[in-house]
């Protein structure tokens, strides 16, 4: 099915959709690596009800992929078949605070969530200042930094499943472990409830500044990068294993292992998604051969490879 015919089928099944449907939309500008092919169809829902109606009407055979802020993501050069969904800040970007309770849309950047909590003198969420992603991604992978994890402060999650039905998940039902949640893959998170602790605003903001300074000193945040590439294996640190295997500065095409922090891959300019993913696989091989450790990707890789020329 072509992108045009897919959109026609969607509009016929859900004529009252208010969100935006785009065909063959480039995703490179939506990812921090600035690489990747197009989405066959990109849908940006107007709100949660619009998302629900869309999913309820969509043919179950059509694959659905969710795109967040694009910080922890490689979109392969052949793009994404079916539908990619991106939740916008207008409908899914609010933060509301009531006492110690924080309700956030999943398009809210993690750094903004940390700031909102600090402004309300709520402690426990400052670690989000060091995570370059959105709340939705943090929920999906139990994101963490600087001694804190999403699981530490989460109360409840709201989402829409593939049938268009609203689902709620308690903290226990999320099944968090290191960089993982057990929530069903077909659920698109739309909102979350967190709980902070009463604290001193100045102290919380000072902690956030410390997190920011540590990140700027140790990570190539001004480069085109996707953040931490590999999960830390049990009994080791990914960056140390990569360094010991002689991979610091390693180059493949336009991609490079960062000299500053070797658990970061960067696009030096002109890289393809295949360059970046291929470099990551080469790093995994060298680490395995050198130390016996098996590194697992933390960055999500989606889509299909480009067809041979």
Swiss-Prot record:
Its EC number is 1.3.1.98. Signal peptide: none annotated. Belongs to the MurB family. PROSITE patterns: FAD_PCMH (PS51387). This is UDP-N-acetylenolpyruvoylglucosamine reductase. Cell wall formation. Its cofactor is FAD. The keyword Flavoprotein applies. Keywords: Cell cycle, Cell division, Cell shape, Cell wall biogenesis/degradation, Cytoplasm, FAD, Flavoprotein, NADP, Oxidoreductase, Peptidoglycan synthesis. The gene is murB. The active site is at residues 179, 228, 298. It comes from Methylorubrum extorquens (strain PA1) (Methylobacterium extorquens). It is found in: Cytoplasm. GO terms for biological process: cell division; cell wall organization; peptidoglycan biosynthetic process; regulation of cell shape. GO terms for molecular function: FAD binding; UDP-N-acetylmuramate dehydrogenase activity. The lineage of its organism: Bacteria, Pseudomonadati, Pseudomonadota, Alphaproteobacteria, Hyphomicrobiales. It catalyses: UDP-N-acetyl-alpha-D-muramate + NADP(+) = UDP-N-acetyl-3-O-(1-carboxyvinyl)-alpha-D-glucosamine + NADPH + H(+). One of its GO terms (cellular component) is cytosol. Residues 34-221 form the FAD-binding PCMH-type domain. The keyword Flavoprotein applies. InterPro entries: FAD-bd_PCMH (IPR016166), FAD-bd_PCMH-like_sf (IPR036318), FAD-bd_PCMH_sub1 (IPR016167), FAD-bd_PCMH_sub2 (IPR016169), MurB (IPR003170), MurB_C (IPR011601), MurB_C_sf (IPR036635), Oxid_FAD_bind_N (IPR006094). Pathway: Cell wall biogenesis; peptidoglycan biosynthesis.
């Amino acid at each position: 099915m072509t992108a045009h015919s897919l959109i026609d089928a969607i509009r016929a099944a859900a004529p009252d959709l208010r969100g935006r449907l785009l065909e063959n939309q480039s995703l490179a500008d939506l990812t921090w690596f600035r690489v990747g092919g197009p989405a066959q169809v990109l849908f940006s829902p107007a709100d949660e009800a619009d998302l629900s109606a869309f999913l309820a009407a969509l043919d179950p055979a059509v694959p659905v992929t969710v795109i967040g802020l694009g910080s922890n993501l490689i979109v392969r050069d052949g793009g994404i078949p079916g539908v990619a969904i991106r939740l916008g800040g207008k409908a899914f970007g609010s933060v509301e605070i009531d006492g110690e309770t924080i309700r956030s849309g999943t398009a809210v950047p993690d750094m903004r969530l940390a700031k909102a909590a600090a402004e309300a003198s709520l402690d426990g969420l400052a670690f989000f200042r060091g995570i370059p992603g959105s709340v939705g991604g943090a929920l999906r992978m139990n994101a963490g930094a600087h001694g804190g994890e999403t699981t530490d402060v989460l109360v409840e999650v709201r989402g829409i499943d593939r049938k268009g039905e609203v689902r709620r998940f308690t903290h226990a039902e999320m099944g968090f472990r290191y960089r993982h949640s057990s929530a069903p893959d077909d659920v698109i998170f739309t909102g979350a409830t967190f709980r902070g602790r009463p604290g001193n605003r100045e102290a919380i903001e000072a902690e956030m500044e410390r997190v920011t300074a540590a990140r700027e000193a140790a990570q190539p945040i001004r480069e085109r990068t996707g953040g931490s590439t590999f999960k830390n294996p049990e009994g080791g640190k990914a960056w140390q294993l990569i360094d010991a295997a002689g991979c610091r500065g390693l180059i493949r095409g336009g991609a490079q292992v960062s000299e500053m922090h070797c658990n970061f891959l960067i696009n030096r300019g002109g890289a393809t998604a295949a360059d970046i993913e291929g470099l990551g696989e080469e790093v995994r091989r060298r680490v395995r051969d050198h130390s016996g450790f098996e590194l697992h990707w933390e960055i999500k890789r989606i889509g299909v490879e480009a067809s041979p020329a």
